[in-house]
């Protein structure tokens, strides 16, 4: 992001810095996004509410449901999965008028029984991450993707693109894998996780704790002001 900002001359280079490892506020890995603290009964209640079985493999996304986030590619990739009767696509977020999805994709999301569309969720995201087996963000651009960090803190493998912001938000091959916007590539990488169990989510949690925990970011902010 810093490199692009300097190249695009958004501000003088000597007035721009990267705070810590690139996130403006960090995330609370100790008291909020911590799988050890999740109330399992609440997770069970959410599973019942959304019709998700323990045996289901849940591919998750959180955020605005718009073209810019790669939702079209994600839905098409989900349609292409083979031997996927036990797969669910969990979309936590809401449709928007600006950059709206095509009507056919929107209708598919609303009507496919394997796709769970929650609409706007006000808090408790740690419980929705607890329903997922994999987090996918096929975005075209980001500042710094908070959902990618939160999901890794919840020990989820992550698939995301190599675009600005996202390219610094996973440890490639360890906490997640990079994808393109090609649905076939997304399918291939989903199956690397779903069938081959290539990524161990526990590494992702430790990586996020090390570099993006909010307390460490706050220390960097304090140093900046001093």
Residue ranges and their predicted role:
Residues 48, 198-211, 223:
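A short, well-ordered alpha-helix in the C-terminal region of glycosyltransferases
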Residues 140:
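Aromatic "clamp/platform" in nucleotide-sugar-dependent glycosyltransferases that forms part
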Residues 53-69, 75-78, 90:
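Conserved donor-binding/catalytic core segment of Leloir-type glycosyltransferases
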Residues 90-117:
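Short, structured helix-loop element that forms part of the nucleotide-activated donor/catalytic region
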Residues 120-122, 127-132:
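Short alpha-helical donor nucleotide-sugar binding micro-motif in glycosyltransferases
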Residues 1-43:
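Donor nucleotide-sugar binding/catalytic pocket of nucleotide-sugar-dependent glycosyltransferases
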Residues 157-160:
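Short hydrophobic beta-strand element within catalytic cores of glycosyltransferases
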Residues 172-173, 177-183, 192-197:
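Conserved acidic donor-binding segment of nucleotide-sugar-dependent glycosyltransferases
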């Amino acid at each position: 992001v810093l490199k692009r900002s300097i190249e695009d001359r958004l501000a003088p280079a000597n007035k721009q810095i990267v705070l810590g490892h690139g996130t403006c506020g960090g995330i609370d890995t100790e008291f909020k996004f911590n799988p050890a603290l999740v109330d399992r009964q609440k997770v069970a209640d959410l599973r019942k509410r959304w019709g998700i079985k323990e045996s289901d493999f849940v591919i998750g996304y959180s955020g605005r449901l718009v073209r810019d986030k790669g939702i079209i590619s994600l839905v098409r990739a989900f349609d292409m999965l083979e031997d996927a009767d036990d797969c669910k696509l969990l979309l936590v977020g809401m449709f928007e008028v600006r950059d709206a999805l095509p009507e056919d994709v929107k209708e598919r999301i609303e009507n496919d029984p394997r796709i769970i569309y929650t609409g706007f969720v006000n808090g408790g995201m740690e419980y929705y991450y607890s329903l997922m087996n994999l987090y996918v963000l096929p975005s075209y651009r980001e500042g710094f993707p908070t959902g990618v960090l939160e999901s890794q803190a919840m020990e989820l493998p992550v698939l995301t693109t190599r675009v600005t912001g996202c390219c610094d938000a996973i440890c490639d091959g360890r906490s997640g894998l990079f994808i393109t916007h090609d649905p076939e590539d997304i399918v291939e990488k989903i199956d690397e996780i779903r069938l081959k169990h290539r990524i161990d989510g526990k590494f992702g949690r430790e990586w996020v704790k090390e570099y993006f925990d909010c307390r460490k970011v706050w220390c960097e902010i304090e140093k900046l002001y001093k």
